[in-house]
């Protein structure tokens, strides 16, 4: 009998199931309990499903496949599979990236580039689930698997940099931070931009690595990657019809499920007659786990030289707090 594994039921993973089913209608389908439910909801209920859980093994005649449930990395149905004969981990979404390489593996690719791409993927797909990632990573490492290849569902196959990607995952799953400040903002008349630029100068003067992004000019995936390991996050907006800029509101919604740890935050805004936007930004930053470390900055119209110096010093003060 033919056997099929369904590691994940999101359509980019399972979308070809109908074609496979048409050719092998009697093949048994192995899936997690959530995977079975999702497959029935999306495709067929008459398929011979078999639910598997961690450490269950199937044999295809030539190969054994050991299953590991990977709930909430990043759906409830996710599974990882290990083949001892091939010394290969089929890791599903874990360890994924969006790298295209004709050699299929990481051979010949710059290590820093590969890890950077993996971080960007993690930040935008898996970041809200660092706690289960950490738990499952410890479980898998505790199984002492002999691994020569890690084959994620997205991107290149890990071969040369397996130890490096595992160490990278350990760090980001533990939400380790670097001595870095990330400032994101939206501005039309440059009032908010001036605040951002002077904060950046203050952080830099205090010895921190600084990244500054205007949201309308930057892919949010890049901003997410940089925020992931930042010690300080500053978010600012101009005031538009008594609310924050739509790009800032969307970004705050993007980070809300992340539940960050080990991050200090500062909210800032420019306004003309309604000065509540910075407070709203601060509230939403705290909802994402970013701890407020200074009073919000409210700037009425154009900042003076003295005010810009104040913002420079605010950044230095925050940087100092982060070293204590």
Where are these regions (language model features)?
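Short, small-residue-biased leader/transition segments that mark boundaries at the very start
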Residues: 1-2
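Residue-level marker for buried hydrophobic side chains located in beta-strands
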Residues: 5, 88-90, 151
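Short internal beta-strands
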Residues: 6, 26-34
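Divalent metal-coordination and catalytic microenvironments
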Residues: 8-10, 81, 93, 133, ...
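Metal-dependent catalytic neighborhoods of phosphoester/phosphodiester hydrolases
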Residues: 15-23
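Catalytic core of the metallo-beta-lactamase
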Residues: 44-108
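FMN-binding flavodoxin-like domain, especially the glycine-rich phosphate-binding loop
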Residues: 101-104, 110-150, 154-157, 176, ...
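Short, charged N-terminal beta->alpha structural module
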Residues: 184-205
């Amino acid at each position: 009998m033919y056997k099929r594994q369904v590691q994940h039921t999101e359509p980019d993973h399972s979308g070809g199931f109908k074609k496979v089913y048409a050719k092998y209608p009697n093949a048994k389908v192995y899936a997690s309990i959530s995977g079975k439910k999702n497959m029935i909801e999306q495709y067929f209920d008459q398929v011979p499903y078999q639910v598997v859980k961690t450490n269950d093994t199937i044999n295809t005649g030539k190969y054994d496949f050991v299953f590991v449930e990977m709930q909430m990395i990043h759906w409830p149905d996710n599974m990882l599979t290990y083949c001892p004969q091939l010394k290969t981990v089929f890791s599903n979404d874990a360890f994924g990236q969006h790298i295209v390489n004709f050699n299929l593996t990481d051979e010949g690719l710059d290590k820093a580039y590969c890890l950077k791409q993996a971080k960007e993927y993690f930040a935008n797909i898996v970041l809200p689930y660092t706690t289960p990632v950490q738990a499952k990573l410890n479980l898998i490492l505790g199984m002492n698997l002999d691994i020569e290849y890690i084959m994620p569902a997205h991107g290149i196959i890990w071969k040369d940099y397996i130890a490096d990607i595992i160490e990278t995952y350990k760090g980001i799953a533990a939400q380790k931070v670097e001595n870095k400040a990330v400032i994101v903002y939206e501005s039309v008349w440059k009032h908010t931009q001036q605040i951002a630029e002077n904060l950046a100068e203050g952080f830099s003067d205090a010895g921190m690595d600084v990244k500054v992004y205007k949201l309308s000019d930057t892919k949010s995936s890049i901003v997410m990657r940089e925020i992931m390991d930042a010690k300080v996050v500053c978010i600012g907006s101009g005031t538009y019809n008594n609310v924050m800029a739509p790009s800032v509101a969307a970004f705050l919604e993007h980070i809300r499920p992340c539940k960050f740890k080990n991050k200090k935050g500062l909210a800032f805004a420019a306004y003309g007659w309604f000065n509540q936007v910075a407070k709203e930004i601060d509230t939403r930053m705290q909802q994402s786990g970013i701890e407020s470390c200074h009073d919000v900055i409210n700037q009425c119209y154009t900042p003076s030289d003295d005010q810009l110096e104040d913002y420079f010093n605010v950044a230095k003060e925050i940087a100092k707090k982060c070293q204590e």
